[in-house]
Design a protein with these regions (language model features):
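N-terminal glycine/serine-rich phosphate-binding loop of ATP-dependent small-molecule kinases
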Residues: 1-93, 119, 147, 219-220, ...
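A conserved helix-loop-beta module that forms one wall/lid of the active-site cleft
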Residues: 194-206
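Structural signal for short hydrophobic segments within the conserved structured cores
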Residues: 25-29, 202, 352, 453
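A generic structural motif
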Residues: 29-30, 98, 173, 295
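Conserved small-residue
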Residues: 14-16, 21, 73, 100, ...
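Alpha-helix termination/capping residues and helix-transition junctions
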Residues: 64-67, 76, 145, 198, ...
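Active-site core segments that coordinate phosphate-bearing ligands/cofactors
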Residues: 3-4, 109-129, 135-167, 177-188, ...
Length: 484
């Protein structure tokens, strides 16, 4: 048996699988977000641990026998979150999350004054990354910054609670911007730019390697053996790729979760920071990936639900009553700023071209189309950087919305395949990493999923949405020149 634990933004998910990768059971526990000011997004690290404990307790109710047979555990999690620990290894403050944009000024300083972030770190400095968050803390909370003993990422804080060891994997560590991506190790130069040293960083392992062993106390609580191995694990996007068998050059995925991700595997470090692409280590040895990210994918739908008081099913029903090829209002999905390709923390969400006859269904269609335009913008960046995938899988909750996938496939002019089993995700990828950490070979573990359906580009949709996308881009450029 193998356990995968994913520390998401909206909740923690734990999955239990057998040696044949059949899902035995899963459990989830929701998480809240603290938003005290515009642009702020925080969570207490203790919330993650409490949620993990709740998912394990839920699994214990009906599957204690299977839990007792777990050989290894894999971890995945939301990337970039800053968890600052004091001399007693207690959090100094709530974790500053990936979608927190307060450090836009600090990101600009690092990006303009330290070109090594783009060359060694492989990425333009954006507010979502960990490095500018630490610099913000140094400037605005110096009394806390000076007490930092260790900085961990969200899933690595959970590893610390499980094992007592401070360790990260290379895929997640890539998102700090303190990693020498090509050489797969911490960079003294990049850390020094933020007033930090390698002594304040966790040890590093490959995602598929063993990192530590479950502590005796936690093993006893969870009814497990004392020799359960903890895999290095992965950031959420790399873990999702592992779960989908996206492990070799030419493999790609589009993830429609809270954020939207376009992911393409490479066999070498291929930075393209100037064009807005991210270059990270993958969760497997000698493997890298390029990635484009938009900050509000399904989160845009969540916002519309909150704003209208309607459920996603109700909004979809109203949308289905509209003409699917009629030009919808245009929506900019920049509710938390934007990463790829704009790198603009000040970008804002907006509707354009709203007419008297438009209603909630039209707004829902506009949101789906606007997020699709954002995904296409990120995809185009990867293509221009040489990372065009030869086949694409869809993952995340939004992948179940065929209309949405149809829009994306038609706009990027590429087929998109949807896995048959929608429970595949970061937690399953974490469980696969656990299997490899216990000694199983990559080719045996990282198989491709069974495909339920492949959505091919629809020429009518392409014809209808191409001019709308161009208009959306023109609107952004015009507004950015005036307001951003």
């Amino acid at each position: 048996m193998y356990l995968g634990i994913d520390i998401g933004t909206s909740g923690v998910k734990s999955v239990l699988i057998d040696a044949g990768q059949s899902l035995i059971a899963s459990a989830t526990s929701p998480l809240d977000i603290i938003r005290t000011q515009s642009g702020y997004s925080e969570q207490h690290p203790e919330w993650w641990w409490d949620a993990v404990q709740k998912t394990i307790a839920a699994l214990q109710k009906n599957h204690q026998h299977e839990l007792s047979a777990v050989q290894a555990i894999g971890l995945s999690g939301q990337m970039h979150g800053l968890v600052a620990l004091d001399q007693d290894d207690a959090p100094l403050r709530p974790a500053i999350l990936w979608n927190d944009t307060r450090c836009a000024a600090e990101a600009q300083v690092l990006d303009t004054q330290y070109p090594a972030f783009r060359t060694i770190g492989g990425n333009a400095v954006m507010p979502g990354f960990t490095a500018p968050k630490a610099l913000w803390m140094r400037s605005h909370e110096p009394e806390l910054f000076n007490q930092i003993k260790t900085i961990l990422l969200p899933k690595d804080y959970i590893r610390f609670r499980m094992t007592g060891e401070k360790i990260s994997d290379l895929s997640d560590a890539s998102g700090t911007l303190w990693l020498d991506i090509e050489n797969r190790d911490w960079s003294d130069e990049l850390l020094a730019a933020c007033g930090l040293t390698t002594a304040q960083m966790p040890a590093l392992v490959e995602g598929s390697d063993a990192s530590a062993v479950l502590s005796k106390d936690i093993a006893q609580q969870w009814g497990m053996a004392n020799d359960v191995v903890i895999a290095g694990g992965a950031g959420d996007n790399a873990a999702s790729a592992i779960g989908l068998g996206v492990i070799a050059p030419g493999h790609g995925l589009i993830s429609l979760g809270t954020s939207g991700v376009v992911f393409s595997v490479t066999d070498q470090f291929a930075p393209a920071a100037d064009s807005g692409a991210h270059a990270f280590c993958h969760a497997l040895p000698a493997t890298w990936h390029q990635m484009g990210v938009i900050l509000s994918a399904s989160d845009s739908i969540s916002w519309l639900m909150e704003s209208t008081g309607l459920s996603v099913d109700e909004l979809t029903q109203k949308m289905d009553a509209t003409n699917s090829l009629e030009t919808s209002p245009i929506f900019h999905p920049y509710l938390s700023g934007e990463r790829t390709p704009h790198n603009n923390a000040d970008a804002c969400g907006a509707f354009f071209d709203i007419k008297r006859h438009h209603h909630q269904g039209d707004l829902m269609r506009a949101v789906l189309q606007g997020v699709s335009f954002g995904i296409a913008d990120a995809y185009d960046v990867l293509v221009a950087a040489g990372g065009k995938p030869s086949y694409i899988l869809a993952t995340g909750g939004g992948s179940q919305n065929i209309t949405w996938i149809n829009y994306i496939a038609s706009i990027i002019d590429a087929p998109i395949s949807i896995p048959k089993h929608q429970d595949i995700g970061a937690a399953m990828g974490a469980a696969r990493l656990a299997m490899m950490a216990s000694g199983l070979p990559i080719e045996q573990v990282c198989t491709a999923p069974e495909i339920a359906e492949t959505i091919t580009p629809d020429p009518d949709i392409t014809a209808a949405l191409t001019p709308a996308r161009q208009k959306s881009q023109n609107l952004y450029n015009a507004i950015a020149a005036l307001a951003y």
